[in-house]
Amino acid sequence: MSEALEAEQKTNPQGDPITSVAAPKPELGARKDPHAEAKRQKVVTPEYLFLEAPRTKEFITGSEAAKEAVRRSNVDLAIAYPITPQSETMQLIGVLYGEGYVKEYYRGEEEVGVMAAIGGGSRAGVRCFTATAGPGTLRGMEGIASWPGHRLPVVAMFTCRVVNAPLAIQPDNVEVAYLLNCGMIVLHAENQQDMYDFIMAGFTISEKNDVTLPVGVCCDGFFVTHARGYVRMQDRSMKLPPRDAWRGAVPVLDAENPPARLSRDAPVQKSNFMAYNIHAVWQQEVWAAGERARKYINQYIGGLLTAENVDDAEAVIIASGSAAAQSREAVRICAEKGIKIGLIKIRSLRPFPTKELRQLCGKAKLIVVPEFNYVGWLAKEVATTLYGFSKAKIIGGPRVYGGQSMPVELIVDEVESGLTGKKSTNVALSSIMGGAVNQDDVAHFMRSI
């Protein structure tokens, strides 16, 4: 939408005037109601909010972007427990509670309790938000992994950081590997704009009655949470419709009409055939619901991936999160050297853009997958997806981990060595995972100078 059109749009579809992003100033001497602005918020449709509403560009941190997304998301319950680099985010959500934008907010005792309480709130039918990072993700994983099977449309923010010793608070997204395989929808934000958009869209997607699953919005720690970037935001006078819990895939708990079953069948499965069958079907339905989320991801955030210059590219970089930002600069440098190269940024990790990748990568000779983790979870997803559909050599790397940075030169070196056959000088971890290569090379190895 053009800047001129944004300036001309002064009302929403209901005819309510749209004010500036800044909070209105109270009259001199007037007694200020801290909840006054929140009370004036008007409900608009998700379609209008995401696709039509005019936006104003602000220069804010990722934590502030998360706050502004929650401000417009009509959240009922937010539960916090501090851990770097997420602490500031939930502190800012507490400010929203003081201003009346979030109905209930408190600090939990630790991550196990937070994830259990968030699950209880969602099970009772209210819209819930929380955030954690690194060791907090792993500590709360038992509760997090239960959300998809119980069909709880929670939105959780994961500000990924190092989890192993020697411990660091710098970005490392190995925790995403755990989240990918528990049944939840997983989105990976590259920057502050993604963080803002994905959180708001997450509530809408998760609560669709043919989905009813939690959404995890991941980012690479400090790179997004504490750095500033431009974010185009809708006016703060608008918000999403409230959660309509009775339209979900499973009934919510009704404390006024006990007893209530937390599971459709006994949680400990015995040898009864019917119990086993019900259990198996329920497990399969969780993953089927995730697949049904594809159409809503396409509708509200514009697709499971974005592609740049891939049509005639001989080399393609596939990345997600902050690695996509580094890769974009690597593409520019490679293009200046005359290399035909494209970039695919993965937005949605679950569901994974299998069909889209196969269509885009059929002609590529080389695929490079840089990551901020040791295990290479994205490279494995890419190699599995393209097996039998592409003859490209797939290089899983460079990989930096334990809080290390990823110089753009590492990515450029992988591209050049992959195309020319010249030995890479990278000391970062990489692995050759497919294509016409020597079988002795198809393994993880540490490259030396």
Predicted features by range, described:
Residues P370-I449:
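Peripheral docking tails and interdomain loops at the edges
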Residues R161-V162, C219-H226, G321-A323, Y374, ...:
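Glycine-rich beta-alpha junction loops
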Residues S2-E190, M200, D220, L410-V412, ...:
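Thiamine diphosphate
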Residues T61-A66, A293-A315, R328, R332:
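Glycine-/acidic-rich phosphate or pyrophosphate-binding loops and their flanking alpha/beta elements
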Residues L167-I169, V286-G303, A319-Q326, I346-P353:
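A general structural motif
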Residues R328-L360:
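Generic long, charged, amphipathic alpha-helical segments
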